[in-house]
Amino acid sequence: VIDSLTLSLQQREAQQLVEPTGWARVDRNIDKIVQALANAKNEEDYQAVGLLCREAIISLAQAVYDPNLHPSLDEVNPSKTDAKRMLEDYIATQLLGGSNESLRKYVKDAYQLTVTLQHKRNANFRETALCVEATRSLVNAIAIISGQRDPYIDF
């Protein structure tokens, strides 16, 4: 029963439509993540999914971060793979003010959940599926914040 439930969840996850962000590398990463989760069978497979989630977040940060527009919060210039700093600087600039505190917290928490789950050496399907969902949530939140999800209006 548990195996059939797990298989059903994996297949449903793989079948869910993923709305493209318009960032080609991010979209390719998300597609790979969904397929890898659907095919994962053991701890090493689940860890590999976590690594793909990490790569997707780095690609996401690289897609939105511009050092000229998003000054460093801690006066440390992020490296090309420092997704945490890039995203923190990005959301601090894009979501200014006290009224956006809960939105900033949501993005930070989604990032932290993804990072925490992807480092579990004994990961299982459920934890990995949560990591995937946290990654997708983070990608979609940043896509919305950046305007990538705005409806197209033809005048």
Where are these regions (language model features)?
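Short, solvent-exposed segments of well-ordered alpha helices
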Residues: 17-24, 40-51, 101, 105, ...
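Long, charged low-complexity segments
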Residues: 75-150
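Internal, Lys/Arg-enriched amphipathic helical interaction segments that engage polyanionic partners
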Residues: 1-28, 32
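Short, hydrophobic, well-ordered secondary-structure elements
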Residues: 27, 31-34, 45-66, 135-136
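Surface-exposed interaction patch
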Residues: 62-79
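Short, flexible helix-adjacent loops and helix caps
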Residues: 35-42, 65, 69, 119-123, ...
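Solvent-exposed, amphipathic alpha-helical segments
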Residues: 28-39, 110-120
